[in-house]
Amino acid sequence: MMKITLKKGILGFENLKEYELLDIENEDILKEFNSTEEDCIGFIVVSPFEIIKEYEIVLNQETIEKLEVKSPNDIMLLNIITVGQTLEESTVNMKAPIVINVRNNCGMQIILQDEEYSIWHPLLRGDGGC
């Protein structure tokens, strides 16, 4: 378990700033990202590199400063999954990753301006994704 403080919360849940990142039993790729302030708020997240191996973002200077990033090795990225009726209908928001500094456990959700990534990227794909 890892406790994480989000500087601005998550889009739609801006008032909730404290979260726990938890392993899911018998699951290597997916994680739980649960609010510690509101019991009924939680998300399933995945590393974007499990979905798109070449996933790449550029952090702006403001984000680097707010999260106190000193090195690219400080960063962990997570993306929120929207669970569908089936796994085939489930999607990953690749456009709004949660950026976490693993040195100080502070994070932010950012919205990428890059049109390359979608908020509805399929969780299951034939190109090496989950």
UniProtKB/Swiss-Prot annotation:
Pfam families: FliW. SUPFAM superfamilies: BH3618-like (SSF141457). One of its GO terms (biological process) is regulation of translation. Keywords: Bacterial flagellum biogenesis, Chaperone, Cytoplasm, Translation regulation. GO terms for cellular component: cytoplasm. It is found in: Cytoplasm. InterPro entries: Flagellar_assembly_factor_FliW (IPR003775), Flagellar_assmbl_FliW_dom_sf (IPR024046). Interacts with translational regulator CsrA and flagellin(s). Acts as an anti-CsrA protein, binds CsrA and prevents it from repressing translation of its target genes, one of which is flagellin. Binds to flagellin and participates in the assembly of the flagellum. Belongs to the FliW family. This is Flagellar assembly factor FliW. It comes from Clostridioides difficile (strain 630) (Peptoclostridium difficile). The lineage of its organism: Bacteria, Bacillati, Bacillota, Clostridia, Peptostreptococcales.
